[in-house]
């Protein structure tokens, strides 16, 4: 009754205008959601052969475990020779042998380089440059990364941990890309995949340094994508929520938490498709559970608002409390 009275005093032209605006907004959301579903479930990604014939090389950093290991295995399965880069030489040798044995019939070659990205040594990067300069590198997977051992307030973050996160996640990724990308540009083909994180997309209290490092990679990768547009080199930052890896410390999969094999398979199948990352250029959220979560947050609560930030804080406070209790129990057993 009251609403009818109010509306009766509003000029018809105003009501028509408001209805038009509302219809436009709703139509935009519907179109966005249809695009999301098509990107996730219908449309295929770019054929990886675009970046080189069989025998072209792929460089994978952080290759000894988790997502990096899975990228190396699946790219080898697709016919790419693999340069494996990580800290532990024994793990790299084991993985190289596994790949060569598993794909012996395909004559897949591997090369390894053991380097500690936290050390940021010029001689390590010189070795990398010498290793890849003579190779036809078609794909670079910037996977190396480090997070906090447990969620921690920024002012309590150990200086060494803070330094390592920035050095590994940011400096390491930039230096590797600066070595590998020029050859791609010269050959006029290539793909640079950089592993991002919801931690860089959503402000994440108690993971402030890690969150900041991943936000930096988002801006850097998108900027690089703009620079290399038209050169034949595609740049894509891959956003993910949780995956069952050593870094996440999660062991059980769920609808929203895939294992590395599933996540990498989806990522490689959806290269060039934005998935849930519709509002960020040169970015993809390929796994459907993560993409739906991203779309919902962006179109309802928003990303950087106080409610979302505080909920994120509460979640990580809980994780920290459980981790500290576990450490206390373990200390008593020792």
Swiss-Prot record:
Matching InterPro entries: 3_ketoreductase_fungal, NAD(P)-bd_dom_sf, Sc_DH/Rdtase_CS, SDR_fam
Lipid bilayer topology: Single-pass membrane protein
First-level EC class: oxidoreductase
Listed EC numbers: 1.1.1.330
Binding site for NADP(+): 59, 116, 124, 143, 210, 214, 243, 245
Keyword Hydrolase: no
Recorded catalytic activity of this chain's protein: a very-long-chain (3R)-3-hydroxyacyl-CoA + NADP(+) = a very-long-chain 3-oxoacyl-CoA + NADPH + H(+)
Superkingdom of origin: Eukaryota
PROSITE patterns, per the entry: ADH_SHORT
Lipid biosynthesis as UniProt keyword: yes
One Pfam family matching this protein: adh_short
UniProt keyword terms in alphabetical order: Endoplasmic reticulum, Fatty acid biosynthesis, Fatty acid metabolism, Lipid biosynthesis, Lipid metabolism, Membrane, NADP, Oxidoreductase, Transmembrane, Transmembrane helix
Catalytic residue positions: 210, 214
Main location: endoplasmic reticulum
SUPFAM superfamilies cross-referenced by the UniProt entry: NAD(P)-binding Rossmann-fold domains
Pathways per UniProt: Lipid metabolism; fatty acid biosynthesis
HAMAP family per UniProt: 3_ketoreductase (MF_03107)
Family, as annotated: Belongs to the short-chain dehydrogenases/reductases (SDR) family.
Function text: Component of the microsomal membrane bound fatty acid elongation system, which produces the 26-carbon very long-chain fatty acids (VLCFA) from palmitate. Catalyzes the reduction of the 3-ketoacyl-CoA intermediate that is formed in each cycle of fatty acid elongation. VLCFAs serve as precursors for ceramide and sphingolipids.
Protein name: Very-long-chain 3-oxoacyl-CoA reductase
Organism of this sequence: Sclerotinia sclerotiorum (strain ATCC 18683 / 1980 / Ss-1)
């Amino acid at each position: 009754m009251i609403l009818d009275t109010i509306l009766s005093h509003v000029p018809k032209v105003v009501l028509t205008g408001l209805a038009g605006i509302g219809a436009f907004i709703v139509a935009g959301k519907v179109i966005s959601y249809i695009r999301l579903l098509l990107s996730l479930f219908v449309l295929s990604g770019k054929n990886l052969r675009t970046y080189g014939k069989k025998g072209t090389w792929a460089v994978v950093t952080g290759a000894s475990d988790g997502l990096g290991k899975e990228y190396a295995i699946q790219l080898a399965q697709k016919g790419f020779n693999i340069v494996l880069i990580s800290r532990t030489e024994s793990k790299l040798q084991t993985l190289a042998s596994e790949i060569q044995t598993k794909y012996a019939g395909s004559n897949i070659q591997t090369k390894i380089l053991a380097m500690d990205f936290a050390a940021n040594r010029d001689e390590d990067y010189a070795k990398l440059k010498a290793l890849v300069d003579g190779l036809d590198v078609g794909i670079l997977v910037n996977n190396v990364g480090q997070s906090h051992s447990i969620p921690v307030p920024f002012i309590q973050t150990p200086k060494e941990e803070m330094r390592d996160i920035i050095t590994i996640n940011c400096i390491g990724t930039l230096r590797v890309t600066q070595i590998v990308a020029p050859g791609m540009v010269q050959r006029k083909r290539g793909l640079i995949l950089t592993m991002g994180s919801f931690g860089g997309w959503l402000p994440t209290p108690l993971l402030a340094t890690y969150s900041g490092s991943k936000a930096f990679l988002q801006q850097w990768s998108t900027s690089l994508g703009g620079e290399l547009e038209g050169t034949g080199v595609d740049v894509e930052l891959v956003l993910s929520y949780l995956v069952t890896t050593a870094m996440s410390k999660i062991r059980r999969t769920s609808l929203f938490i895939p294992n590395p094999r599933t996540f990498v398979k989806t990522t490689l199948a959806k290269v060039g498709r934005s998935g849930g990352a519709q509002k960020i250029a040169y970015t993809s959220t390929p796994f459907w559970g993560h993409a739906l979560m991203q779309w919902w947050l962006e179109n309802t609560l928003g990303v950087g608002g106080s409610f979302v930030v505080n909920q994120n804080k509460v979640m990580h406070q809980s994780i920290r409390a459980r981790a500290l209790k576990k450490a206390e129990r373990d200390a008593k057993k020792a």
